[in-house]
Amino acid sequence: MKTKLNELLEFPCSFTYKVMGLAEPELVNQVVEVVQRHAPGDYSPQVKPSSKGNYHSVSITINATHIEQVETLYEELGNLELVRVVL
């Protein structure tokens, strides 16, 4: 994945992912599980429901150590079945 993030970020740094997906109970656990694989830590993601309650947005901040870690997490979070968008 070619991005300009590498030019914009200085590692290590805090990096927040906003994951939007279906409002299913397992969404948050799946997001944390993927993040734990690449950036182990103690996470307390923030969850906000959509106005109609069909979707949830999950915000989770990691301590990113390199651009490959950031890009891999974008890809793996986007591949989760419940996820619709990763910002």
UniProtKB/Swiss-Prot annotation:
InterPro entries: UPF0250_YbeD-like, YbeD-like_sf
Pfam families documented for this protein: DUF493 (PF04359)
Gene Ontology annotations for the cellular component aspect, listed alphabetically: cytosol
Domain of life: Bacteria
Similarity-based family: Belongs to the UPF0250 family.
PANTHER family per record: UPF0250 PROTEIN YBED (PTHR38036:SF1)
HAMAP family membership: UPF0250 (MF_00659)
Protein name per UniProt: UPF0250 protein plu1293
Lineage: Bacteria, Pseudomonadati, Pseudomonadota, Gammaproteobacteria, Enterobacterales
